[in-house]
Structure formats: C-alpha cells, structure tokens
C-alpha cells in the first residue's frame, strides 16, 4: 500500500485536494466571508490557471508541428480522418443521450420559473454568424494576433439618422427607439484563437514533413522545444493539487443560496449528471471496446490524473499538458498520435458540452411550457453539436454557446441566466468528460494507426542504417585513395 501511494503520490494528492477543497468550502460558508477574502482564498488556484495557460500556446505549437513533421502526408491524413470521425460520432451519441434523458425524465416544470424568477435579457445570436466566425477563426489574417485575439460577431443597435424632411410621427418614432435596428459587426475580442493557431501549426507540420531532410534542423528545434515545455509542465503538476484545492474551495464560497438553488434545479442537475455518467461510463467505454477489443476501464484508470485536473480547472485546454503525460507515460500511446489528436480534440471535441446544451435547451422549453416538435428536437441536436464544436475550450464557454441553440428553436435567450447558479459544478464535470473523450479518441486512433507508424519507424531505421553504411564506405574509400601506391613508395 505504501509503495503504491509513493508511486502514485501526485494522483493521491490531486484526488485529496478535490475532496478537501469541497469539504473546506462547505465548512467555511458559515463564516460569510467577504468577496475580498474569497478572492484571497482562490488566489493560489488563479496562479495555477495562469501557469497552465502560459504553457498552452508553446505546447500546441511545438507538439503539433513536431508530431506532424515526423509523419508522411498519408499518415497525417489517416490520423486526421480517424480523429474527426470519432469526434463527430461521439458528439452525436452524447447529444442523443441527453435528449433521450431530458424527454423521459422531464425535469422542467413551469413552477420552477416562478420560484427562481424571470431571467435577465440575453444577447442575440445568429447560427449563420456563428458558422462564419468559426471559419474566420480557422484562417486568421494575422497569426501573431491569433495568439491573443479572436474574431466574434457582435450586434449593435443602430438608430436611423434624422433628416430635415421627417414628419412629426417619424421623429417621435425615432426618439422612442421603435425604428432602431440591429446591425452585425465583426470585431476582435480578447482570448487566444486556438482553432486558428491549430490550423496554422498543422499546415507548418505537414509542410516540414514534405521537405524531409532539408527541414531536419527546424523539426529538431520543435522536438526539443516540446521536451522543454513538458519538463516545465511536470514542475507545475506538483503545484496543481494545492491550486485545485483553492479553486474548488473559492468557487463553493462564491455561490449564493446554494441549498435553495440546488433544491429548485435538482431534477435538471440529475438529468445532466445522469447523461454525463452514461456517456462516460457506458457509451465511451463501449465504443473503445468495440473498436480496440481492449478493456476500456483499464485504459481509463491511466487517465485519472487528467480527469481530476479537468474537474479542478474546468478547461480542457488547460488540462492538455497533463493529458499528454497520462497517455504517453501511463498508457504508452505514441507521441505522434497524442501531439496531433489531443490539441484538435481539446478544441472541437466537446461531448459533455454538447450533451449539456441539448438538455439545457429542452429544459428551458419545458419550464416555459413550450412543446417542441420532432423537427425542433432534431434542430436542437444539430445546433448543440455545432455549438459544442464552436465552443472555445475555456471555462463556461458552453453557457455562451447555449444562446445559439436557444435562438435556433425560438426559445427565450434570457432564460439561460436561470441555470447559471449550478453551471459552476456542471461545467467542471462536463469538462472532465470532454478530457476523457479526447484521450480515449487518441487511444482508438493509435490502435488503428500503430501498424503504419511501426512500419514507418522500421523504414526510417533501415534508411538511416543504409545511410550510415554508405558514409562508412565513402570514408574507407577516401582513406584508401589517400594511401600511396607501390610506385609512389618506390619513387620515395
């Protein structure tokens, strides 16, 4: 037992930090701490988030470029197609699971809205504009700018200009705002454009792969940079248990009227948590077993550290460094697979978010007494899938993209604010499911590409041996040619 604890000390500390953080948070709620004191308690957790975020950009760049540069174009294409197929399928399964549960359990009761009160006015969101933003962010006009800003369509209320010949009725309408209209404006907002950076790095990695030996020095630079970043990550990991403890404790202390909110939204929480449990403990393991014929729960055991970190940070991108270590060191997945599949998965594969958005949208319809037709349910499933892909892998992004799903079926956007009170908990749990889905996807992709990768390694080793042998022959020939002949000896 002692030897097991010593071997898995970091995992034990991380799990203990989650339990202690929750326990201390609930115990300290009775002290009615001020927002300033709560901020002080959360500060070590804030530092952890800063450390992890600091690693994301260099890690994504070095891992993607070094991983793809060591593959040929055919292998890159195969890895990409396998990963995207897996992502689309598991997201669809998650959405269907969520919709089935919310329709069967029916957690939404119109009396809930009366108890909680009406929501605050929300923002307008267009499905088309969201799609266009996704495409704009995929191809940033400035790569440096993409490291700290992304494109987002915002809606501005515009008032028509008053002209001299306006009649009194028109002037009155202009003054009271009834002639105002909403105009879409494409703006830059703060936050790294992860999707754009990934697309750029994929292009660079594939180009380096095609250049072959010419690009050897540049490839080695990114390989070494990747190792340096992972060394820094290992140092941060030993600080993470304390940071996670403070994050969870601070978040529990921030929540007002925790008991009342939990009572009123209990069935909604049960529905979401049941869906996430079914997806993570049944659907994903079943997909893994059918595709690899291996025990999925043994594989999942090796991912426990990443799962717990996702629970603490509520961000799949921030958990990325730990997921790399779990897959490569605990489970022996080839780094060329993890370095390509995981950054893409952390950006577009959001199974937990898709399930949550489908459940939340239908729950809001139920508390408003709105019966959704089959066509509207299909619309919810499609837009939830799209919204989960468009959601940045940052805390509470799912709450923002919920607006897209509600707008698509004509539900009141302002009612999103009714479920904000419990989102801090659901966000952490669905993020941990997102991390699990990404990692299991990497395991499945590795299973199908292992033979090709091994063949590529054997070919590379043979080519290297042949090259060394040729160089030795040339060296021996040069030495032989430099020796004097018998005639030259006689002359001397």
UniProtKB/Swiss-Prot annotation:
Annotated glycan sites: 166, 176
UniProt keyword Ion transport present: no
Compartments where found: Membrane
Main location: membrane
Keyword annotations from UniProtKB, A to Z: Glycoprotein, Membrane, Symport, Transmembrane, Transmembrane helix, Transport
Taxonomic superkingdom: Eukaryota
GO CC term, one of those recorded: plasma membrane
Transmembrane segments: 8-28, 47-67, 85-105, 192-212, 228-248, 270-290, 358-378, 389-409
InterPro entries to which the protein is assigned, alphabetical: DAACS, Na-dicarboxylate_symporter, Na-dicarboxylate_symporter_CS, Na:dicarbo_symporter_sf
Gene3D superfamilies: Sodium:dicarboxylate symporter (1.10.3860.10)
Extracellular compartment spans: 106-191
A Pfam family it matches: SDF
Any GO MF annotation of the entry: glutamate:sodium symporter activity
Membrane-related topology note: Multi-pass membrane protein
Family membership noted in the UniProt record: Belongs to the dicarboxylate/amino acid:cation symporter (DAACS) (TC 2.A.23) family.
Role of this protein: Transports L-glutamate and also L- and D-aspartate. Essential for terminating the postsynaptic action of glutamate by rapidly removing released glutamate from the synaptic cleft. Acts as a symport by cotransporting sodium.
Protein name as catalogued: Excitatory amino acid transporter
Organism: Onchocerca volvulus
Lineage: Eukaryota, Metazoa, Ecdysozoa, Nematoda, Chromadorea
């Amino acid at each position: 037992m002692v030897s097991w604890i010593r071997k898995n000390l970091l995992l034990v500390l991380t799990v203990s930090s989650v339990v202690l953080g929750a326990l201390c948070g609930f115990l300290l709620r009775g002290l009615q701490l001020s927002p300033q004191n709560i901020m002080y308690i959360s500060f070590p957790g804030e530092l952890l988030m800063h450390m992890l975020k600091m690693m994301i950009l260099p890690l994504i760049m070095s891992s993607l470029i070094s991983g793809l540069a060591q593959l040929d174009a055919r292998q890159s294409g195969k890895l990409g197609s396998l990963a995207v197929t897996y992502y689309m399928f598991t997201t669809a399964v998650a959405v269907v699971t969520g919709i089935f549960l919310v329709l069967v359990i029916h957690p939404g009761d119109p009396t809930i809205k009366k108890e909680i009160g009406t929501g605050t006015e929300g923002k307008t969101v267009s499905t088309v504009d969201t799609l266009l933003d996704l495409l704009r962010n995929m191809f940033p006009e400035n790569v440096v700018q993409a490291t700290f800003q992304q494109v987002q369509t915002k809606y501005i209320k515009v008032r028509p200009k008053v002209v001299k010949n306006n009649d009194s009725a028109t002037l009155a309408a202009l003054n009271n705002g009834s002639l105002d209209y909403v105009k879409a404006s494409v703006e830059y907002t703060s936050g790294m454009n992860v999707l754009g950076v990934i697309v750029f790095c994929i292009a660079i990695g594939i180009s380096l792969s095609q250049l072959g030996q010419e690009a050897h020095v540049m490839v080695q630079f990114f390989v070494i940079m990747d190792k340096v970043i992972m060394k820094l990550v290992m140092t941060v990991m030993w600080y993470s248990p304390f940071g996670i403890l403070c994050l969870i404790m601070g978040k529990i202390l921030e929540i007002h009227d925790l008991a009342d909110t939990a009572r009123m939204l209990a069935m909604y929480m049960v529905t979401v948590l049941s869906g996430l449990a079914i997806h993570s403990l049944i659907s994903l393991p079943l997909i893994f077993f059918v595709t690899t014929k291996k025990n999925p729960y043994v594989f999942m055991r090796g991912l426990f550290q990443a799962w717990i970190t996702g629970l603490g940070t509520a961000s799949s991108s921030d958990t990325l460094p730990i997921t790399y270590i779990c897959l490569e060191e605990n489970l022996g997945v080839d780094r060329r697979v993890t370095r390509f599949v995981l950054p893409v998965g952390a950006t577009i594969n959001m199974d937990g978010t898709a399930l949550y958005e489908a459940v939340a949208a239908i729950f809001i319809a139920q508390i408003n007494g709105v019966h959704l037709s089959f066509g509207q349910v299909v619309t919810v499933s499609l837009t939830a899938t799209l919204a989960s892909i468009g959601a940045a892998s940052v805390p509470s992004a799912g709450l923002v993209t919920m607006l897209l799903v509600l707008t698509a079926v004509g539900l009141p956007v302002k009612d999103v604010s009714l479920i904000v009170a419990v989102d801090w908990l659901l966000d952490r749990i669905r993020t941990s499911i997102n991390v699990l889905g990404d990692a299991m996807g990497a395991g499945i992709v590795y299973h199908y590409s292992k033979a090709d990768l091994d063949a590529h390694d054997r070919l590379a080793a043979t080519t290297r041996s042949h090259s060394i042998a040729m160089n030795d022959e040339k060296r021996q020939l040069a030495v032989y040619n430099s020796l004097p002949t018998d005639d030259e000896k006689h002359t001397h």
